[in-house]
Regions:
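Basic/aromatic-rich interaction segments and small domains that mediate binding to polyanionic partners
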Residues: 197-225
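C-terminal regulatory/interaction module of P-loop NTP-utilizing enzymes
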Residues: 1-185
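Short, surface-exposed loop and linker segments with low hydrophobicity and enrichment for Pro/Ser/Thr
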Residues: 186-191, 215-218
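Short coil-to-beta transition motif at edge beta-strands of beta-rich domains
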Residues: 189-199
Length: 225
């Protein structure tokens, strides 16, 4: 059965996010029939963290001209028949951790974001905006995958989502902010040029843990020897 529409679930998260991550998963507030159904979750393309969305305040409203809501709604309806997935071809390559449903969900999220930023079908999409949309789409889809992993389904254990910009680009990994800890070392692969290392210490020094980062920058001049 093919569906021509989609659904959006909106609700309040009444518990602390960090606590919920320790004792359960982020789909816990859903009704019992849904909260542990990984097959249902696998069809959710995006989990948007409402706790990161700022509340409305006067600074978010404009005094300039705007579009009437019914006209704007019609514009969005017309955009539904279009796709921006072609903007990804030859420019973005997904990592091996993404399944077929992961790729489908991420592609649709990227397409939707690009349609909001570039309503014109022929408008060229900049590399910066494309990478922003790719990273956001991977994050919101991975948030779904992480909850499936917490429920205990072995098929969802690989959540290391990554992408590469261009055929010669460097593979970059995308994580979800709520899983990161300031005081610990996560299991995420490090960026290129970074490594963790241990120092055994010495007679007057204690053992230590160090994170080494290699950076590249322009030179400051020429030295003649």
């Amino acid at each position: 059965i093919r569906a021509d529409g989609s659904i959006v679930l909106v609700g309040n998260f009444d518990v602390d996010v960090e606590h919920q991550q320790r004792v359960g998963h982020l789909f816990g507030p859903l009704p019992p029939e849904m909260r542990n159904d990984t097959a249902f979750m696998d069809r959710i393309h995006c989990f948007l963290p409402g706790w990161d969305v700022p509340k409305l305040n006067p600074g978010l409203f404009t005094e300039h001209f705007g579009l009437v809501s019914d006209f704007l709604s019609e514009c969005f309806t017309q955009l539904r028949s279009q796709s921006r997935v072609s903007s990804l071809q030859g420019r973005v390559y997904w990592g091996g951790a993404l399944s077929g449903r992961d790729t489908n969900g991420v592609n649709k999220t990227v397409s939707g974001l690009l349609k909001l930023m570039y309503p014109g079908m022929q408008a060229p999409v900049s590399e910066e905006d494309l990478e922003w949309a790719v990273r956001l789409a991977l994050e919101v889809r991975r948030r779904v995958k992480e909850q499936q992993k917490r429920i205990g389904a072995a098929e969802f254990r690989n959540t290391h989502f990554s992408y590469t910009m261009g055929a010669e680009g460097v593979e970059k990994f995308v994580s979800t902010p709520e899983l990161q800890s300031q005081g610990g070392i996560g299991d995420e692969p490090l960026e290129c040029g970074q490594i963790w290392t241990l120092s055994p210490g010495g007679q007057d020094e204690h053992p230590g843990l160090f994170r080494l980062e290699v950076t590249e920058g322009p030179g400051g001049g020429v030295r003649v020897l």
